[in-house]
C-alpha cells in the first residue's frame, strides 16, 4: 500500500469533512441570532434544527456506494458545489419555510461522512484502519468550529454575513478536491442489490447500526440542541452557550481516534460494553438533576463515551463487512445521523408536556441498556467462535 498517498488523501478528506460538517451544523449556533430577526415558534425551531439531519443521514448510503464506484474525489467535489446553493439561500432567509428548505439541503454536508469511511481504509493495512478512520472522524470537529466561531462572527458582522462567509470555504475545498483528490482510487463494483441482499442477512449490521444510532446520534443531537437549551434553561449568554456546546463537540471529536486505537489494540466489543456503561450513567445523571454542575458532568460523560464509541464502531465495520464496505458504512452512518434527528424533537415534546426534559434523557439511558444487551450477546458469540 502507498503510505504517502494514504496520508495525503486522509489529510485532504479529513479537512473536507471539517468543511462539510461546518456547513451541516451552521444553523444551530446561529439560531439564537436568527430567532431575533425571524418570527419562529419553539416547535418550528426544533424542526428547523433537526431538518439538516434528514438528508445528511439518508444520503449516506448512496454516497458510500458511489464512493466505491467513482471515488471519493468526485463525490466530495460535487457535494461542495451543490452545497453552495443552500448556503446562499440560508443567507437570504427571512421565513421559517426558507430556513427549513435551506436546512434540508445542508444535509449534504453531513452525508459526506460516509465518503471517507469508505475511501480511507483502502489506503491502509487492517491493523491501521481503526486509527485511520478515527483520524478521519476528527473532521466532525467542523461542528465545533461552527459552534465556537459562528456566534462570535455573528456578533461582529451579523448572522447573514456569517453564513455567506461559508461560500468562500466551500469553494476553496471544491477546488482543492478537484486538483488534489485521487483519481486512481481503487474501485469496488459489486452490484448494489447483491450487497444489500448479503448485508440484510448479517445481524451484525443491525447491531452496529443501533450502537451508532446512539453514539453518533448523541454527538449530533447534543450539538444541535445544546446552544438553545443552555440559553433557555440556564440563562447562559448566547456566545457562552456556543462555546460550551463547542467543547462538547470537540471533546467527542478528538476522542474518536482514541476509540479507533483502542479497537486496534484490544477487543472492540468489550471496550464498547465499558463505554456504554459509562454513557448510561451520564444519561441517568442528566435525567435526575437540573443543576448546572451535574448537567455539565453528565454532558461530559456522554461526550467522552460518544467519541470513543464512534471510533470503536468504525473499527468494527470494515472488519465485519470488507466486501460491502461502501453500503455497510453508508447504512451504519445513516442510522447514526438519524439518531441525531429525533432527540431534539423528543426533548421539545417531553418538555412541553411535563415541563421538564428529564424524561427525554432517561430514554437515552434505556436505549443504552438495550444496546448493552446486544453487545453482550455479540461478545458471547465471538468468544464461542474463538473457542
Swiss-Prot record:
Membrane topology label: Multi-pass membrane protein
UniProt GO molecular function: nitrate transmembrane transporter activity
GO cellular component, one term: plasma membrane
Compartments where found: Cell membrane
Induction field: Positively regulated by the two-component system NreB/NreC.
Chief subcellular location: membrane
Organism: Staphylococcus epidermidis (strain ATCC 35984 / DSM 28319 / BCRC 17069 / CCUG 31568 / BM 3577 / RP62A)
Summary of the function given for this chain in its UniProt record: Probably required for nitrate uptake under anoxic conditions. Also possibly involved in excretion of nitrite produced by the dissimilatory reduction of nitrate.
Keyword Electron transport attributed: no
Domain of life: Bacteria
Transmembrane regions listed in the UniProt entry: 14-34, 45-65, 69-89, 97-117, 137-157, 161-181, 211-231, 246-266, 268-288, 294-314, 330-350, 358-378
Keyword Electron transport tagged: no
Protein name according to UniProt: Probable nitrate transporter NarT
Gene3D superfamilies: MFS general substrate transporter like domains (1.20.1250.20)
Gene Ontology biological process terms in this record: nitrate assimilation
Keywords annotated in UniProt: Cell membrane, Membrane, Nitrate assimilation, Transmembrane, Transmembrane helix, Transport
Family: Belongs to the major facilitator superfamily. Nitrate/nitrite porter (TC 2.A.1.8) family.
